[in-house]
Amino acid sequence: MRSSDHMAFAGVLPIVFLLILSSADLAASQSQPGPTNQPYNYGRLSPAMAVIVVILIAALFFMGFFSIYFRHCSGVPDAGVSPAGGARSRATVNAAARGLDVSVVETFPTFLYSDVKTQKLGKGELECAICLNEFEDDETLRLLPKCDHVFHPHCIDAWLEAHVTCPVCRANLAEQVAEGESVEPGGTEPDLELQQVVVNPEPVVTAPVPEQLVTSEVDSRRLPGVPVDLKRVKFSRSHTTGHSVVQPGECTERFTLRLPEDVRKRIMKDWKLNRTNSLLVLPRGGSSRRGKPIDRSRARSDRWLFRKTPSFLWRSRDDGSIRLGATGSVRASAVPNSTGSDSVRAGDRWAFLRNASFLWRNSSVHVPRGGVNKDGEGTSVKSTGASGSTSGSVRLPV
């Protein structure tokens, strides 16, 4: 039982109690014998009884009125509605309570405003109906294909998490998905060609600007007796908080993206193709590049040597060796270039000083055990050969 039913039941109880008391008083008064001079003894309706009857009728009237009102506002289907219609209404109410599914929202296309700015019909600027900001050229738009209204993706996604309608025109997007309609409106290719032949027989009507002018003239010449879309007038637009921020009758063209039919079809087709490609899982292939075999035991010890030593313990010497605190030194001699200069050693020393320790990558530095000289320093390993690929060489990342 709903809260409205509890309130109505609580209001009826005092009235029924007063009615029972008044009935008891009326019965007691009728049981007493009347005066002997009156030939007929008819019971009279006392003023208190009349007031109680009026109050009871008014209470029943208000109970019925509020019951219908609360039932209409809560969206509960009437008893006369068919089971299929009632199930559809309940599904719509449940969908409105939880919003649209993320997979359904992802079917609405997104694109840059600069891609359609020069192709849209009309010269006015577009703006988002939720945040009320005009679109910039580098901003992304999300189009609702059912009503052609555009928004920022983060704005409309947050709205559709709790709603199933368009914030501008209140078009129910859940009904479109439930009925199995296609997201892209329109018929097949032959139907579109037939419509173009029938609707656009004159070259003047095919131009986009006269088409818009004709539409505005038809709307301005609407007769008073012609019914207007009451749902659009009543729910013109709602903000993210739910209250209406656009007055009825206000122009909403600044929220609507009008595109030629061929451009619109191309955008929808490209969006579907991109979504299909994004869902494909490409097989992972092996790399064609092969390196030289590495001694894993030596590599583990080398990695431990370079990773466990902090960067502040490095110190460069003038002879090109690198000292590792009290653990010893790893000396990398410079490789002479074609001019015979010693520029490589200076460059290596600068790299050792300026780069952090975690950026180093050694190829084959091996520190033998027990190698301590008389000065208390570890033995140094010198690189031999012009290529610098033997033990003791240090490679910098490219």
Curated annotation (Swiss-Prot):
Induction description: Up-regulated by chitin or cellulases elicitors.
UniProt subcellular location: Membrane
Gene3D superfamilies with a match to the protein in the record: Zinc/RING finger domain, C3HC4 (zinc finger)
GO terms for MF: ubiquitin-protein transferase activity; zinc ion binding
Membrane-crossing segments per the record: 50-70
Pathway: Protein modification; protein ubiquitination
E.C. designation(s): 2.3.2.27
Low complexity bias spans: 378-398
GO terms for biological process, alphabetical: defense response to bacterium; defense response to other organism; protein ubiquitination
Keywords: Membrane, Metal-binding, Phosphoprotein, Plant defense, Signal, Transferase, Transmembrane, Transmembrane helix, Ubl conjugation pathway, Zinc, Zinc-finger
ZnF endpoints (RING-type): 128-170
InterPro entries: RING-H2_zinc_finger, Znf_RING, Znf_RING/FYVE/PHD
Catalytic activity: S-ubiquitinyl-[E2 ubiquitin-conjugating enzyme]-L-cysteine + [acceptor protein]-L-lysine = [E2 ubiquitin-conjugating enzyme]-L-cysteine + N(6)-ubiquitinyl-[acceptor protein]-L-lysine
Free-text comment on this protein's domains from its UniProt entry: The RING-type zinc finger domain mediates binding to an E2 ubiquitin-conjugating enzyme.
Protein family per UniProt: Belongs to the RING-type zinc finger family. ATL subfamily.
PANTHER family xrefs: E3 UBIQUITIN-PROTEIN LIGASE ATL6, RING FINGER DOMAIN-CONTAINING
Protein name per Swiss-Prot or TrEMBL: E3 ubiquitin-protein ligase ATL6
Species of the source: Arabidopsis thaliana (Mouse-ear cress)
Taxonomic lineage: Eukaryota, Viridiplantae, Streptophyta, Embryophyta, Tracheophyta
